[in-house]
Amino acid sequence: MDSGDEALRRREQVLRTFFDDEGRLTTIPAKHAKRLVVLDRLAQRFEPGERYPETEVNRLLRSAHDDVAALRRHLVDEGFLGREAGVYWRTGGTVDDPV
């Protein structure tokens, strides 16, 4: 198995561990590498080029986990979302991976 296959296998394992069958996040990972995998998946809920008011960001994130403030902060701090004056937009993450 090459390193790309191994990385994909580890990523899928993290997603299975932290998301339930309905696509809800069971817990926010404490380990940074695992949290990045989870945040990448959450960032896919946002369309590149679209601007989102905070209320819409909260709605989209609440469908995944109740701690929307923590998720917003992590997404911004890790470069998956940008934020200015209460408006958010996608700045990173995987684009072609199905949600």
Predicted segments with their positions:
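Amphipathic alpha-helical segments within well-ordered protein domains
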Residues: D40-A43, N58, R62
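Short alpha-helical segments that sit at the start of domains
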Residues: R9-Q44
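A short, conserved structural fragment
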Residues: D77-Y88
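Short amphipathic alpha-helical interaction segments
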Residues: A64-H74
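Eukaryotic partner-binding/assembly regions in large regulatory complexes
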Residues: M1-S3
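Short, cationic-aromatic polyanion-contact patches
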Residues: V87-V99
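Short acidic, hydrophobic short linear motifs in intrinsically disordered regions
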Residues: P48-L61
